[in-house]
């Protein structure tokens, strides 16, 4: 007797993000083994990331060099200025997004700039630039909108500004650390005066004897909810009362975990995210309990991530938190991989839903005051806002985990694959399928037709059969079907498409198969 065709469904495929850490046979169907150039969209579907368009039309004196840092100065009157560095120079974007080089305006001999790995911080309408081995610099638009100077050349300068590699602006002052000669002292400026380092309420905090896990060095600083976080390589110190530095005190410590990359630290409304020696971590503040439990966001991709980090120059690792996009991005540039950690919702074990991007090639990031996301590129600043990488398509890939279709002792005979997709227009989706952990996939193509704007309710495919929302962007839904063939005990399917101007998400997958021989 002929076996009946059975249908196996995956609703909200890829909802849990990547999992390359655990055995693929033990994974929930919501995990992905490949999710390249993907995000988890606002409805919990695996979907295409956005691309980028150029903010500046020409490079000016930046030339074909990387934009290593981007910073936004927000002044009291609401004036916004985008500052950036590359080619051992400092630039700003004009009101028409023209690249304008800032020249030295201090009146003496111009400082020698040999790198562009600045950490920027703004205080009282002035942006400060700190970088190891360099004189700290300032851009003060109240004095000049076309020049920079040394901090030491500002009127009212007092004491010696530390030649630090780390600087943040918090609680109305600058905090700096890790000079060429001292790596265990935090220096803080006077209130509202980033050029005053000895009088008023300025001072320093030596933590050399405070480290609880042996000698360490400061690798980063962060501030949150009145607390100052001092990151070492293998430990973290948490100081309370940082609004009044003279009386602040140690509140908590985290041992065995620290920060290994200065520019991986990002503060959100509730967390401080950073790259540790074992992955991306989140310090969850519970102010009432004065505790700081840590959480491993990269648990499901830890080995892959840390393998990538091992081959990096740590100062080249950059990150950003985007409140609008609800993700934390971390780039490992040597392998051209951007790790996207979704922050809309975490998995039950505290891990984040992770996807990767492989062709956008960020050199730096900026999340602007208005929520827009800027990306440092070679010769340009990119704006994350379109579904092309500067007029070029990019390929989205999603592959399921390996799974038996009901009985691991029975061979499955594939008959048909279908995918419900939302978005896309006039583009090919390549279906791939393979058996028993082999990568010699079979494939077939289905085409999303040219389509206009429609409105669809998506409750039919919502998790737990509940209404998630309406796709208010008016993007059409299509069911794509291909005939499949081949047999195996364990099946994996994949879905690839070139993104070229239109968003694409996968809402549901169905696999039709017959049972074969018992083995």
Where are these regions (language model features)?
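Beta-sheet repeat architectures centered on beta-propellers
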Residues: 1-100, 110-127, 256-271, 277-519
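A short beta-strand motif characteristic of beta-propeller blades
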Residues: 52-62, 100-110, 147-157, 204-211, ...
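Hydrophobic core segments of beta-strands in well-ordered, beta-rich domains
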Residues: 82-85, 129, 169-178, 220-232, ...
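Structural signal for beta-propeller blades
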Residues: 90, 136-137, 183-185, 236, ...
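Surface-exposed loop and turn segments in beta-propeller and other repeat-based domains
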Residues: 106-110, 154-157, 196-213, 294-311
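Asp-box/WD-like beta-propeller blade repeats and closely related beta-sheet repeat scaffolds
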Residues: 140-169
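Solenoidal tandem-repeat scaffolds enriched in leucines and small polar residues
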Residues: 167-199, 204, 212-216
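Surface-exposed extracellular loop regions of Gram-negative outer-membrane beta-barrel proteins
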Residues: 228-254
């Amino acid at each position: 007797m002929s076996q009946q065709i059975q249908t196996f469904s995956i609703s909200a495929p890829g909802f849990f993000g990547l999992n390359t850490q655990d055995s693929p046979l033990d994974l929930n169907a919501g995990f992905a083994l490949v999710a390249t150039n993907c995000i988890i969209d606002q409805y919990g579907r695996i979907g295409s990331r956005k691309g980028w368009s150029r903010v500046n039309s020409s490079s000016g004196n930046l030339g074909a060099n990387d934009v290593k840092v981007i910073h936004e100065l927000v002044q009291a009157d609401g004036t916004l200025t985008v500052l950036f560095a590359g080619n051992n120079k400092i630039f700003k974007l004009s009101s028409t997004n023209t690249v304008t080089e800032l020249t030295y305006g201090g009146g003496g001999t111009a400082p020698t700039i040999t790198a562009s790995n600045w950490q920027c911080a703004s205080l009282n309408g002035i942006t400060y630039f700190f970088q190891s081995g360099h004189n700290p610099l300032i851009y003060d638009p109240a004095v000049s909108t076309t020049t920079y100077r040394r901090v030491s050349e500002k009127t009212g300068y007092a004491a010696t500004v530390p030649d630090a590699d780390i600087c943040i602006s918090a609680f109305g002052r600058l905090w700096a650390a890790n000079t060429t000669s001292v790596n265990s002292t935090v220096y803080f400026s006077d209130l509202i005066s980033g050029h005053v380092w000895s009088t008023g309420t300025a001072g320093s905090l030596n933590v050399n004897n405070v480290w609880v896990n042996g000698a360490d060095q400061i690798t980063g600083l962060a501030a949150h909810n009145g607390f100052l976080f001092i990151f070492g390589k293998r430990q973290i110190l948490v100081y309370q009362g940082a609004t009044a530095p003279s009386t602040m005190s140690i509140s908590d410590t985290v041992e065995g975990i620290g920060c290994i990359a200065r520019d991986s630290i990002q503060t959100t409304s509730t967390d401080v995210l950073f790259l540790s020696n074992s992955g991306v971590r989140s310090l969850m503040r519970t102010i009432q309990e004065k505790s700081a439990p840590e959480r491993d966001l990269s648990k499901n991709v830890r080995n892959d991530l840390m393998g990538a980090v091992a081959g990096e120059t740590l100062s080249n690792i950059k990150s950003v938190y985007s409140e609008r996009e609800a993700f934390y991005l971390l780039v490992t540039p040597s392998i051209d991989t951007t790790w996207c950690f979704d922050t809309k919702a975490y998995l039950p074990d505290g891990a984040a839903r992770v996807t990767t991007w492989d062709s956008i090639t960020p050199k730096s990031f900026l999340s602007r005051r208005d929520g827009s996301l800027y990306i440092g590129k070679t010769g340009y600043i990119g704006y994350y806002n379109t579904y092309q990488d500067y007029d070029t398509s990019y390929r989205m890939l999603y592959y399921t985990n390996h799974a038996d279709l009901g009985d691991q002792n029975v061979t499955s005979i594939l008959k048909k694959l279908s995918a419900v997709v939302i978005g896309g227009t006039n583009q090919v989706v390549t279906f791939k399928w393979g058996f028993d952990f082999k990568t010699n996939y079979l494939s077939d193509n289905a085409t999303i037709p040219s389509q206009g704007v429609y409105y669809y309710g998506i409750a039919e495919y919502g998790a737990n059969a509940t209404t998630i929302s309406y796709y208010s962007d008016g993007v059409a839904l299509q069911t794509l079907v291909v005939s499949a063939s081949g047999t195996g005990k364990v099946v994996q399917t994949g879905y690839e498409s070139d993104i070229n101007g239109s968003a694409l998400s996968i809402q549901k997958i169905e696999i039709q198969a017959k049972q074969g021989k018992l083995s």
